[in-house]
UniProtKB/Swiss-Prot annotation:
Residues 53-83, 187-225, 339-395, 471-503, 525-670 are annotated as: Disordered. Sequence repeats lie at residues 143-158, 171-186, 200-214, 215-233, 234-252, 253-268, 279-293, 294-309, 320-334, 335-349, 362-376, 377-391, 392-406, 407-421, 422-436, 437-452, 464-477, 478-493, 504-517, 518-531, 532-545, 546-559, 560-573, 574-587, 588-601, 602-615, 616-629. Signal peptide: none annotated. Residues 638-654 have a biased composition (Basic residues). Keywords: Repeat. This is Uncharacterized protein ORF50. Residues 342-362 have a biased composition (Polar residues). Residues 205-225, 363-395, 471-482, 490-503, 525-634 have a biased composition (Low complexity).
Length: 670
């Protein structure tokens, strides 16, 4: 028995009346022959026509959308519309019995089950079911790069824990041949949040970027205001631009124009091949703040920052890296002390109410100069103060300055002041100063070592470094054991201590600045490290921060952007092992060409951890931004892994492109 459903006439008339489009045909055949039973044939034809009613099938060898062959012998009088505006599905079902099919002249007895074109004279369609289907699609479009040959890739792993949130916003870089890759693994703990925001800066003038935490504008008289929660919009690159946002924290990139304002301080050495390393501590309720300003303005600069997230609960780690050219700045700040409410800028012990301030002046202007400052741990008493200043190196070549400040005595209200005169201006000179220990009485004053009593002050000043090449300045200060002591190098084991280390930029080439401080093991400590930017070429900034083992620790590292070309910024943050840890990484854009920004954040092992990474776009050409954030391994379920790689080549800057979104990697949960 043969069943023919014929509706083509009615639908054809309605299609012609409504001026619908039929332009090309997509045809598929399904032949099913049950045994025993009738043969069932299902033919589905999708037709799209263009608006020209006089067009012939030969005028359109294939559909404009699908590229398939048209149906032969379609009436040339059918109206045609623009491809993809309308699609018509024509279905034909024929159920055949055991008797033979009536023979029609020019029509084969079987329907070929193939996609090959059919001879126009071989098929005669007697019945069709026509269904009009109009589909409107809104694809997920990633961010479009504003430059030429730019690439923006984003892969986001879905959080494996309960109530986890993973947000990623990435704007495309505005330079040519720039690549921005971000891979973020969602935390595996419960109530964990992983937020990664990468914003490009608009390249036009009078542009406005409103969202949250914009980078600082690169034009003159620009303003960047914001309070950031998760999103860091790109800042305009033109003049008189405004970027306003609302968020919890604001870490704008450094402004490149005049009268601009930024939240980044200190300069890295201005010489070539300078090195500055910073390693941050960890403790319970500790705070570690490391600021590594913009790298030198030369080419081929490298900035590396490795920050271990605190292992306690409610820990926070922030890292912002700069960019410059082939200079090296190395600052090492060990873990924080074991006391409560301690603050250290380099490394501070477990004492209470202690203050440590360490200042290392600019490096020499010659080549191959070395400045080494070592500050031992401060005393175990409370309210101690130790101040050590190491001036610039001498102007000769191959000079060495070594200053050693022993531990202060155990008396109370003692003061230790050590001054090392400037080094000679000749070559191969060496200055070594060692001050003996201060007496153990109260209210004592010593030129080198301070007693262990309370309310003692130790001040050590090293001479100015020579301007020649190959000079070395070394300062070592032992911690006092009394209370109320303040040290500029190492802070005691009491609580509520502060350690601050500031290193000025060296103006020579091949200079090295090294600051090492022992880590405090107490809680509520703060470590702050500020390094001035080097203006020379081939500078490297490396910051390594060890994770605090206490709870509620905070690690903050801020590095301003280098203005030179071919700069490299690398940030690595180890996972905090405690619960409720927070890791925040902010990287300002390098303004030079061929710059590389790499940020790697290890997962916090506790629950309720937060990982936030903000990377501004490199404003030069051939810049690469790579951000990899591992998931926290605390409470929750699932695992996320992400890897990002970016490479760019070329020169110049591209125009601004439209904003884009992102889509998750195949297989990832949204």
């Amino acid at each position: 028995m043969e069943l023919l459903v014929v509706t083509l006439t009615c639908l054809g008339m309605s299609l012609l009346a409504s001026n619908l489009a039929l332009v090309g045909v997509v045809r598929s055949y399904t032949n099913e022959t049950p045994t025993p039973g009738p043969e069932t044939e299902l033919i589905t034809t999708t037709v799209a026509r263009m608006t020209d009613p006089t067009a012939k099938p030969s005028d359109f060898p294939g559909d404009a959308v699908t590229g398939t062959q048209p149906v032969p012998r379609e009436p040339s009088s059918l109206p045609r519309t623009t491809p993809s505006l309308a699609h018509t599905t024509i279905s034909k079902m024929i159920s055949l019995g055991t008797r033979p099919r009536p023979t029609i002249p020019g029509v084969p007895t079987t329907i070929p089950n193939t996609d090959a074109p059919v001879d126009p004279g071989s098929v005669h369609t007697t019945a069709r079911v026509v269904t009009d289907i109009t589909t409107k699609q809104t694809p997920t479009t990633p961010a479009t790069p504003a430059g030429a040959n730019d690439t923006a890739n984003i892969t986001t792993a879905t959080p494996a824990g309960a109530n986890d949130t993973a947000n990623i916003t990435t704007a495309t870089p505005a330079g040519a041949n720039d690549t921005a890759n971000i891979t973020t693994a969602t935390p595996a703990g419960a109530n964990d949040t992983a937020v990664t925001t990468t914003s490009a800066t608009p390249a036009g003038a009078n542009d406005t970027a409103v969202t949250t935490t914009p980078a600082t504008p690169a034009g003159a008289n620009d303003t960047a205001n914001g309070t950031v929660v998760t999103t860091t919009p790109a800042m305009p690159a033109g003049a008189n631009d405004t970027a306003n946002g609302t968020a919890v924290t604001t870490t704008p990139a450094m402004p490149a124009g005049a009268n601009d304002t930024a939240n980044i301080t200190t300069a890295t050495p201005t010489g070539a091949n300078d090195t500055a390393n910073v390693t941050m501590p960890a403790g319970a309720t500790d705070t570690v703040v490391t600021t590594t300003p913009a790298m030198p303005t030369g080419a081929n600069d490298t900035a590396n920052i490795t920050t271990a997230t605190p292992a306690g609960a409610n820990d926070t780690a922030n890292v912002t890296m700069p960019a410059g050219a082939t200079d090296t700045v190395v600052t090492t700040t060990p873990a924080m002390p074991a006391g409560a409410n301690d603050t250290a800028n380099v490394t501070k012990p477990a004492g209470s109410t202690d203050t440590v301030v360490t200042t290392t002046p600019a490096m020499p202007t010659g080549a191959t100069d070395t400045v080494v400052t070592t500050t031992p741990a401060m005393p175990t008493g409370a309210t101690d103060t130790v101040v050590t200043t190491t001036p610039a190196m001498p102007t000769g070549a191959t000079d060495t300055v070594v200053t050693t400040t022993p531990a202060k005595p155990a008396g109370a209200n003692g003061t230790v002041v050590t001054t090392t005169p400037a080094m000679p201006a000749g070559a191969n000179d060496t200055v070594v100063t060692t001050a003996p220990a201060t007496p153990a009485g109260a209210n004592d004053t010593a030129n080198v070592t301070k007693p262990t009593g309370a309310t003692d002050t130790v001040v050590t000043t090293a001479t100015v470094k020579p301007t020649g090449a190959t000079g070395t300045v070394t300062t070592t200060t032992a911690k006092p054991t009394g209370a109320n002591d303040t040290a500029n190098v190492t802070k005691p084991t009491g609580a509520t201590g502060t350690v601050t280390t500031t290193t000025a930029k060296p103006t020579g080439a091949t200079g090295t600045v090294t600051v090492a401080t022992a880590k405090p093991t107490g809680a509520t400590g703060t470590v702050t490290t500020t390094t001035a930017k080097p203006t020379g070429a081939n500078g490297t900034v490396t910051t390594t921060t060890a994770k605090p083992t206490g709870a509620t620790g905070t690690v903050t590292t801020t590095t301003a952007k280098p203005t030179g070309a071919n700069g490299t910024v690398t940030t690595t943050t180890a996972k905090p092992a405690g619960a409720n840890g927070t890791v925040t990484t902010t990287t300002a854009k390098p303004a030079g060409a061929n710059g590389t920004v790499t940020t790697t954040t290890a997962k916090p092992a506790g629950a309720n951890g937060t990982v936030t990474t903000t990377t501004a776009k490199p404003a030069g050409a051939n810049g690469t931004v790579t951000t990899t954030t591992a998931k926290p391994a605390g409470a929750g379920h699932g695992h996320g892994h992400g890897h990002g790689h970016g490479h760019g080549h070329g020169h110049g800057h591209g125009g601004r492109g439209p904003p884009g979104g992102h889509k998750p990697k195949s297989g990832a949960r949204r």
